[in-house]
Structure formats: structure tokens, C-alpha cells
């Protein structure tokens, strides 16, 4: 049983905005410290950014408008806490306490992830999809149900009829669709709106990739300030995640679909 949402679901719109701001921070510094929370809906986008580099309000506004439309923006930016900053003063260390799990993807998860991408490539609007054994449920906005039924004749499609979706119908918040992003690898923390020093980003990515490579579950934990995780220097964990994010096209692009 697995649920997947597409990049235009309001929660994913929030994730994408958060990712775009992290991308902005990385344009200003090689290793910025930033954590972004976004709440969006009904014409308003609220953002709080804790960051070691100041972001230009015009760049923030441009990112929000590009991703979510011409919304009213409430942007609050504050410096990173001094104790947290001191943790990274002499090198990259684990940025938080955490527990982490990497799980090999199931065939069901792979199948639904591909279906979600296929549908979204034709209908780039808010949508949510479920696969439970042989039961496929497709909720796709801004489409005539009959069109999807021709492609997926055995699926349950838009059970309440055609709908519009988007942030004028539903609110979105950062890291609220972790099941969609991580499948069985969900544990304590979210992937989005954070720099690579954050274990929620780097260790989650590392554990997920290791699970796909080995075909076995991976369980890890770390304490803030740790220099090693899974017997590897934390800097190596971070570089693994950095390469993955780059291969995805950056933090905003990574936020579209997550790891799955």
C-alpha cells in the first residue's frame, strides 16, 4: 500500500518553495546554514527562514511567484541560533539528533511512482494517487475523468467527480508529505527546506541510497555534533547527499518528488 502526490499538490508546492530558498542560499555560500518553513494557501504564503546568509527579498518573491503564482508573501528571516552555528564553526558536523531508516523500494512503490509521473506529465496539476495491491485510485485535478479512464480502465478515478485543487482549495505546509517522498524510509525528520549539514537531509539520503544498493534495510542514529555516521566521516555523508541533490537538479527539483 502506497500513496504518491505530484509536485502541484499544495504540500509539495510548499516543499518546492522551501527548496528554492535553499538553492538561493547555496548561490551565496558553499556551505550555508538554513532551515525554511512554508505555509501556503488561499492567496497567502508565510515563510520563516533561519539562515546564516541573508536572502534578497526580491529573489524570495520571484521564487514564490514562479512556483505558486502571484501570492501575498509574509517573509520572516532570522539568523541561525548561536549554539547551532558554533557546532559547525570548525567543520561540518552532524547538525541535529536523529533516527534514520533506509528501506529498499517495493515493486508496488516503483509502479505507483511511475504512474504518478506519467499522469503528471500530461496533466501538470494537483493530484494524489494510491496503489493497494490491485486497487489503483487516481485523484487528478483539472482533467475530465473519462480521459484518464481510457488510459487506466480498472482504476478508481476522481471518486467525487472532477475537481480543481491547488492552493485555493487546500493549504500546504513543508514536509507534510513524507510518506510520498520516502515511502517506508520515513522516520523522524523531513527532507525539505534544509541545508546539507542537517542530518534530516544528508543521512536520510545516504540511508535510502544504501538500502537501494544493498537491498537491505538500513537503520542509523546520530547525535548533534557527531563527526561520523555509519562508520563514515560526516563530511563523506554530506558529499554523498550533495551529489544526489545536484543530480536531481537542486533542492527545488528534489522537492518535486522526493526520494521515491
Where are the predicted features?
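A domain-level signal for the structural core that forms small-molecule/cofactor-binding pockets
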Residues: 1-260
Amino acid at each position: 500500500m502506497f500513496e504518491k502526490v505530484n509536485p502541484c499538490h499544495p504540500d509539495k508546492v510548499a516543499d518546492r518553495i522551501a527548496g528554492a530558498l535553499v538553492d538561493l542560499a547555496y548561490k551565496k555560500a558553499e556551505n550555508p546554514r538554513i532551515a525554511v518553513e512554508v505555509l501556503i494557501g488561499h492567496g497567502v504564503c508565510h515563510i520563516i527562514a533561519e539562515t546564516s546568509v541573508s536572502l534578497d527579498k526580491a529573489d524570495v518573491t520571484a521564487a514564490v511567484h514562479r512556483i505558486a503564482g502571484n501570492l501575498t508573501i509574509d517573509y520572516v528571516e532570522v539568523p541561525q541560533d548561536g549554539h547551532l552555528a558554533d557546532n559547525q564553526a570548525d567543520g561540518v558536523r552532524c547538525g541535529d539528533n536523529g533516527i534514520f531508516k533506509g528501506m529498499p523500494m517495493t515493486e508496488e512503490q516503483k509502479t505507483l511512482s511511475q504512474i504518478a509521473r506519467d499522469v503528471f506529465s500530461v496533466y501538470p496539476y494537483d493530484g494524489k494517487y494510491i496503489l493497494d495491491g490491485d486497487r489503483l485510485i487516481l485523484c487528478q485535478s483539472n482533467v475530465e475523468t473519462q480521459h484518464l479512464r481510457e488510459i487506466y480502465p480498472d482504476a478508481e478515478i476522481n471518486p467525487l467527480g472532477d475537481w480543481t485543487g491547488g492552493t485555493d482549495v487546500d493549504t500546504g505546509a513543508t514536509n507534510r508529505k513524507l510518506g510520498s517522498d520516502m515511502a517506508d524510509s520515513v522516520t523522524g525528520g523531513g527532507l525539505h527546506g534544509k541545508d546539507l549539514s542537517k542530518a534530516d537531509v544528508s543521512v536520510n539520503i545516504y540511508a535510502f541510497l544504501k538500502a537501494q544498493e544493498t537491498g537491505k534495510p538500513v537503520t542509523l542514529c546520530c547525535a548533534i555534533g557527531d563527526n561520523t555516521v555509519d562508520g563514515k566521516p560526516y563530511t563523506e555523508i554530506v558529499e554523498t547527499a550533495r551529489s544526489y541533490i545536484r543530480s536531481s537538479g537542486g533542492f527545488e527539483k528534489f522537492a518535486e518528488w522526493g526520494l521515491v
